[in-house]
Amino acid sequence: GVHSGDATLVFPAQKIYFETARRIKKVSKMIAKELNISGPFNIQFLAKNNDVKVIECNLLASRSFPFVSKVLKRNFIETATRIMLDAPYTKPDKSAFDIDWIGVKASQFSFARLHKADPVLGVDMSSTGEVGCIGDDFNEALLSAMIAVGNRIPQKNVLVSSGAAKSKAELLEPCHMLAAKGYNIYGTAGTAKFLNENGISATAVCWPDEQGDLNIMDMFSKHVFELVVNIPKDHSKRELTNGYKIRRAAIDHNIPLITNARLASAFISAFCNMDEKDIQIKSWQEYK
């Protein structure tokens, strides 16, 4: 999995089952009551098919605390402090999450300064900063956040190395969107074969350790690609070596790199459905 500090956060949640959300609220109340918690606390949940499990509970305010405060326009630090001091406070309304805007928190990475480091995310936190952006809808908020941390919307050429079967299937619809928008899609052998078999024109490129006219490392040197989606597949020596070389080349040539299929899918869907020029410039106070 990916460390929660590196994950892209969407608030309020857009794709959680109603029953899952209900159970999360119920479990949170039970834990707070049983442990007699009066201040901020952080719970990490694992949810699948409405089955909710608690991974960990920490009696502290996470970095998402100020982000949530900004999105909901309520200073939860002040509220928590008042509760801990037994001072008067106003309870948040039950409809506090019913807002007409969405917040997205994206992580900032410094792999360009960490020479030879593998820019892939894992259980250890790698991000060195983050940004929070608000938009009228998910696409606007996500694009704003992704651009704010240094990503650029591609104009013509996208490289996709989609990894295992699950991530290939997850990236199929986004690749349909890219093709419909006129993008040139390049893929490693397995990905290109999968896309072509599913009606998407994709050009196969050679792995770094292969010889050919379309060697991927030569194409990086020529700055052919404007976005690289590289989903790690397995831990075989060849996959690890070639995958690392692709990811590192993207960073070294200052090309936006995404290594998570869900984030890649969301980002592609966002810029295919919304032009960068349509992103509104609004102050925080205008969201009301």
In which residue ranges do the predicted regions lie?
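Peripheral docking tails and interdomain loops at the edges
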Residues: 206-208, 215-288
